[in-house]
């Protein structure tokens, strides 16, 4: 009997949205994605204690400055967790740049180069890593620089068509348009509290972005992210990639209802439009209150979890 997870794998690259090694072993995804929140939750698991100890020892050996030690330890911990995941997944790991750098192009570029260097020192080549960066104008510019250096990027916290378009025009390797957080916003800001999967505003957003990319022949990979229910996932069957939390992977594995491909572009590829200017980007992005609020909110939440991670590391120094 074919499960929905098996059926989905036949039309979409399945990625695990977790830092939990045991969950990754269980569901055998192609790739895995992490973020500061997932690194924080993974760090509380007992099997990760040696990775934390190693990161702290590395940081202490590298610098005598306490502030620098903390920065080095959190970078090394994120990479250590990534290295463990890469022992299991055949594809790529996404490791995120500190969200507090989201509005600083040069600092983002420097952090990305540092993370890549840590992976390279451990024998991992660039083609197995994606550097996650928030889809701010500054983050997109950083990704444009990094892509030219052979460092592939995953542009995250993507909520608007303007963000998606700017990423494609910058030659970004992959984007992570969010589904569930868009649904959250509409539930909180409208009278409608329930949405059928096909009417889900997050599903509609990713579908539009997918079709736009295919219509204009952009090579940027579309990886739907942030799911609240299995219905959102099945409505996006056929998307290039989907990154899915273990609880929803479990539901897909336990369901054998037939899965129908929903995303597939069959039209003719058209000539690409002129790239958005910075002012056009901000006008279009800021015309969507949901996108403005969710991008800022996402950056804040990741920054808060980064600070919690720092506090946890400091207690172990």
Curated annotation (Swiss-Prot):
Question: What pathway annotation does it carry?
Answer: Carbohydrate degradation; pentose phosphate pathway; D-glyceraldehyde 3-phosphate and beta-D-fructose 6-phosphate from D-ribose 5-phosphate and D-xylulose 5-phosphate (non-oxidative stage): step 2/3
Where does this chain mainly localize? Answer: cytoplasm
**What residues form the catalytic site here?**
132 (schiff-base intermediate with substrate)
Q: What is this enzyme's catalytic activity, as reactions?
A: D-sedoheptulose 7-phosphate + D-glyceraldehyde 3-phosphate = D-erythrose 4-phosphate + beta-D-fructose 6-phosphate
Establish whether keyword Transport is in the entry. Answer: no
Tell me which UniProt keywords the record has, alphabetically. Answer: Cytoplasm, Pentose shunt, Schiff base, Transferase
Could you describe the subunit structure of this protein? Homodimer.
Function in brief: Transaldolase is important for the balance of metabolites in the pentose-phosphate pathway.
Family statement: Belongs to the transaldolase family. Type 1 subfamily.
Q: What is this protein called?
A: Transaldolase
């Amino acid at each position: 009997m074919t499960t929905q997870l098996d059926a989905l794998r036949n039309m979409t690259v399945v990625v695990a949205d977790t830092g939990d090694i045991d969950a990754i072993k269980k569901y055998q995804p192609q790739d895995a994605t992490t973020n500061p929140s997932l690194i924080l939750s993974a760090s509380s698991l007992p099997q990760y204690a040696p990775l934390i100890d190693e990161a702290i020892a590395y940081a202490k050996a590298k610098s005598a400055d306490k502030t620098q030690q903390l920065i080095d330890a959190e970078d090394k911990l994120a990479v250590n967790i990534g290295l463990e995941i890469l022992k299991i997944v055949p594809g790529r790991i996404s490791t995120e740049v500190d969200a507090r750098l989201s509005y600083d192009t040069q600092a983002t570029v420097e952090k990305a180069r540092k993370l890549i260097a840590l992976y390279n020192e451990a024998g991992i080549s660039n083609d197995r890593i994606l550097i996650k960066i928030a889809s701010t104008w500054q983050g997109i510019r950083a990704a444009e620089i990094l892509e030219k250096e052979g460092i592939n990027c995953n542009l995250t916290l993507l909520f608007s068509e303007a963000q998606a378009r700017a990423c494609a025009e910058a030659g970004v390797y992959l984007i992570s348009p969010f589904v569930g957080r868009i649904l959250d916003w509409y539930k909180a800001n409208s009278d409608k509290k329930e949405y059928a999967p096909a009417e889900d505003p997050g599903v509609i957003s990713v579908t539009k972005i997918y079709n736009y990319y295919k219509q204009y022949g952009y090579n940027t990979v579309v990886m739907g992210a942030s799911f609240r229910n299995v219905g959102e996932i099945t409505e996006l069957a056929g998307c290039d990639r989907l990154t899915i939390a273990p609880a929803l992977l479990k539901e897909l594995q336990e369901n054998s209802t037939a899965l129908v491909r929903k995303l597939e572009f069959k039209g003719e590829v058209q000539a690409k439009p002129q790239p958005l200017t910075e002012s056009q980007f901000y006008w279009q992005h800021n015309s969507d209150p949901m996108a403005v609020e969710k991008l800022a909110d996402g950056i804040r939440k990741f920054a808060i979890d980064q600070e919690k991670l720092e506090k946890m590391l400091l207690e172990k120094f």
